């Protein structure tokens, strides 16, 4: 299985995909789309930092780049309504679509929470020289990823205009994403998966407007007091040892629970 982007093909199991979902679609570089369904251009405006308020104690969650639905499954167990979107029709995905084409009208509700786990392929340190010169894209797929990410951020902006108390979380393994210009207006935390019960260290950045969620203290490489597997580059331990991007992209249940519980903490 492979993804074609311009003249290039990327294998579904190519390690350069990092946590990507192994896209089946023919996806081509397209210019960033402006927000539809609104006459207000909020692309360059700072986002409000809102306290989460879910009126009925459950609320609605949109899960973008959902893959294995790590967050969505936990949210459903808490009684939330979940709409899961991905490039591929994995199990229990509600809408399979090129997320650059997704519009707010495609989602059956206004979300209280948005979780997004965009493809890290072109931002990961292991493949950065293939795809970028610093933050500038040099591959077709890097251009595509930037366009997709700018687009879903525009959807977050649009939902926030309708529901200013909505909280959002954007997740990506620690890498070049934190340097991208379109991410600079967001508050960023860094978590280590091992502190949430995972056997991988996997330092991961999470951007959010939540004032409630506070991540656990970070671990560090070579920490002999932690259970995480040593995973030097090229080894078969840690995230690199997981077979397929679907498994590599799974988020620790304890982290998902913490995110969801913090999002419903301020329910009236």
Language model features: what each stretch is:
Residues 2-4, 11:
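Serine residues within intrinsically disordered or low-complexity segments
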Residues 4, 19-21:
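Short Gly/Ser/Thr- and charged-rich N-terminal loops/segments
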